[in-house]
Amino acid sequence: MSRLPLSLRMLARAIAALASVATAAGCVVVNAGAAGTPPNLFFDDFSYAAPGELAAGGWQLRDGVGHPGLPGGRFSAGAITLLDDPLQPGNRVLRMTAHTDGTGPGTVQAQLCHQRKYLRGTYAARIRFSDAPRSGVDGDPIIESFYAVAPLAHPFDPDFSELDWEYLPNGGWGSDKTRLYGVSWQTVQIDPWESHNSAHEEFASFDGWHTLLMQVTKGEVHEFVDGRPVAVHDGRNVPVAPMTISFNLWFAVGGTLPAGGAPRVYDEDIDWVFHARDQVLSPADVDAQVRALRADHVTRTDTVPAANPPLQPRCDI
């Protein structure tokens, strides 16, 4: 019989003894301060030696052409690397890199996705956004994201589901303003474009490390940035189908700098990603659980059951 490490057992006992637990909107709501590890948990802090090990952790690295991004551009598995964290000795981070010279053939983007089995509960990730390219001239409409998505079977598919965090340091989509989008989708048609969603925008620079969190119940999506509540989405904009947890880094159509010259190279780093199935956890709860997992040297765990019947993960919608 397997046993939790000591610190996690102590946290679990604290929940049983001290936490007030209620059932609401189809999820278990764990009050602030109740930081025990949930039974259905996915956590990955990307402590892999090389990208080839990501598949064993359930990740798929996108390789090929397709939506989104510049026409003619491609997604490359080689655009995903793992490196030592210069700010935390012993820690590793996953890095997505995208570059463009303003042409489709000169554009490479990055994307990875996990298994398609996530719906209600709490999603969180710690991400480093970048306002400027690592090299090259600044100004291209780069999109830096963390999201969960179910495939679009056809235009305006009623079962389409998507939750997005998208950072636009150089603007894009008709505006030059730096902003962070928090979006919960109802449905969409790709071509010609027509979308139905509920969106929140934070007009500020988010350069550097940030923790993004989403609480999903049957009736609402609550969004938090660095522990601060920023938006609530409800009604038909709440996810209805199991989704993949995904990250991507890509260039929006329209607004790229003139073609030619040295490639403009952008990075997005990911420290960890977390999902607690069917549990609404506060930002403080998630931070406490991540600290406990790391204290017990748990670099990856996945006890979230597969969808029934199993669903094929896809890195494109």
In which residue ranges do the predicted regions lie?
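Short tryptophan-centered beta-strand motifs in secreted/extracellular beta-sheet-rich domains
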Residues: 46, 123-125, 208-216, 221-223
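Glycine-aromatic-enriched beta-strand/loop faces of beta-sandwich-type recognition domains
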Residues: 154-208, 255
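Bacterial N-terminal signal peptides that target proteins for export
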Residues: 2-15
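Bacterial N-terminal signal peptides
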Residues: 14-26
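Short edge-strand/loop segments of extracellular domains
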Residues: 142-159, 168-170, 228-229, 237
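Low-complexity, Ser/Thr/Pro/Gly-rich disordered linker/stalk regions
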Residues: 27-140, 144-151, 271-317
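Aromatic sugar-binding interfaces of carbohydrate-active proteins
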Residues: 58, 156, 204, 220-317
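Structural recognition of the beta-strand scaffold that forms the well-ordered cores
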Residues: 95, 164-166, 246-248
